[in-house]
Amino acid sequence: TSLNIFGYNTIKSKGGLSVYSSEYMRKGKETLMADQMIFKRCEIKYMLDITQAELLKNQMKQYMTADEHGMSTICSLYFDTPDYLLIQRSMEHPVYKEKLRLRSYGTADKDTTVFVELKKKYESVVYKRRIAMTEDEAERYLLFHEKVKDTQITREIDYCLKNYKKLSPAVMLSYEREAFYAKDDHEFRITFDQNILWRNYDLSLCKGIYGEAILDKNKVLMEVKTAGAIPLWMVHFLTENQIYKTSFSKYATAYRTIYAREQRRSCPPENFFVFTGDEVVQQAIKC
């Protein structure tokens, strides 16, 4: 093991890099395996139109099974610094990046079970840690730093909260998702996201599902989630239909809109008049 710059011990394994605190490592493997609620996988995104998505779903019937919950509505409340440091760093495509969010399935109320998630990406491998609690408990934990059960995951979340000063709700995202998993390998999953909405006001999972659309109605964001290789039938479909991976990020797309609007508000129009005594001088300003 070796200590990395984020304060965690890293363990090289066949599947890649796992990250744990030095204190937790001393507790031994049995505790490590029993307590963790960690997802480790590669996530590959593709932008499809509705026709392509339906063609793929039809072909998937032979190899995959629809999730028993069917179409679900996912709400994610992303936390960031006042100057959006986390998403700005993420958009620079660093070797390591992380996001902190609060997730619910549908609109929550104070007693709804929600998930505090710390999503990390290291060398293209995604590590997601999450803990379940009520929406009220999550709000008091993330905003007011009230104590919760001490686990490896909460320590990593605490480290994130301490490392990035003044983290608070920044963007609310919601979308409808269809999920499928392979019949012979439940770790291979495909999801289809539509009706992706965002807002940077009313920042609560309890406020409802509304906001501005990120994608055209004809577009579908597909994510392939796997701990191994993509099956050949899937590779053939993508090749035949000229579908290529994309680095599309819901949060980053919303942030670009926020940033562009802030720039327009802080920038004078391209041409404006400056009055200097009896003279009128036209200025051409480029933002």
What residues fall within each predicted segment?
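Phosphate-end processing signature that detects enzymes handling 5′-triphosphorylated RNA
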Residues: 6, 15, 19-287
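Extreme N-terminal basic, low-complexity initiation segments
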Residues: 2-9
